[in-house]
């Protein structure tokens, strides 16, 4: 009986330790790899040929490339047009592809539309959970603007693209000449706030993956959050969800 108890206790201890490691794990850096180069006025960057399921959503003339802002931290950038730079920052949980329909309607002979994807989303690098801070994302996006050697721009941002994009520009305040703010704010909260219960639950690495990647895939349900479900068909959900 004592032997059975000790074996059971050992199994329980191993299970508990394993569960604790899983539920608190931080994750690891995943760095994407491109092919070839893209040459801009600012220099030469690593090209990233888009897979067909993503490329089919874009019109002609797009450039797709990485800007390595820190060792292993690559930001995927979509760019189209020539002229005055317009920096367009998406929010969570989408990517630079969010602005593809707006870009289609803008005069690309007069505007250079620059659409970076935040680290952790789309084709950009994936980082440990602990590195997802507003300060880090501000610095990384500012690194993109710096390496592109922009001297002035108009900014457009929505959702978390507001605090991140405006925060990035706060690090280089001379860049901004105008702003178009959508559903967003100027900065991150300056005081502690309580997360909603759903946000608090999915913040946990294991539970978040189980819920949002297994039981209730977030991108599969995005159409229900839109005013017009037809604007978010299965191939668009795939566009945002597959790289993540």
Regions found by a protein language model. Name each.
Residues 1-13:
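N-terminal Sec-pathway targeting helices
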Residues 5-6, 28, 103-104:
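Sequence-pattern detector for short linear motifs
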Residues 16-64, 71, 75, 85-87, ...:
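Flexible "cap/lid" subdomain of the alpha/beta-hydrolase fold that forms the substrate-access gate
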Residues 73, 78-123:
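Conserved HGGG/HGGXW glycine-rich cap/lid loop of the alpha/beta-hydrolase fold
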């Amino acid at each position: 009986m004592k032997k059975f108890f000790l074996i059971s206790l050992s199994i329980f201890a191993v299970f508990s330790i394993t569960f604790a490691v899983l539920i608190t794990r931080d994750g690891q850096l995943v760095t994407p790899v491109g092919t070839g180069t893209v040459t801009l006025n600012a220099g030469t960057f690593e090209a990233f040929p888009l897979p067909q399921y993503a490329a089919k959503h874009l019109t002609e003339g797009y450039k797709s490339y990485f800007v390595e802002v820190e060792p292993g931290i690559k930001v995927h950038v979509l760019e189209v047009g020539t002229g005055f730079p317009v920096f367009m920052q998406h929010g969570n949980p989408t990517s630079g592809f969010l602005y593809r329909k707006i870009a289609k309607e803008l005069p690309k002979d007069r505007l250079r539309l620059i659409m970076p994807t935040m680290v952790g989303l789309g084709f950009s690098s994936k980082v440990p959970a602990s590195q997802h801070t507003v300060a880090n994302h501000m610095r990384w996006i500012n690194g993109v603007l710096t390496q592109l050697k922009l001297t002035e721009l108009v900014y457009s941002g929505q959702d978390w693209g507001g605090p991140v994009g405006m925060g990035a520009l706060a690090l280089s305040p001379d860049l901004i000449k105008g702003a178009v703010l959508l559903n967003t704010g100027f900065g991150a909260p300056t005081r502690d706030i309580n997360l909603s219960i759903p946000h608090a639950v999915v913040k946990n690495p294991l539970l978040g993956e189980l819920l949002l990647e297994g039981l209730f895939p977030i991108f599969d349900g995005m159409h229900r959050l839109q005013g017009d479900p037809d604007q978010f068909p299965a191939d668009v959900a795939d566009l945002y969800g597959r790289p993540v």
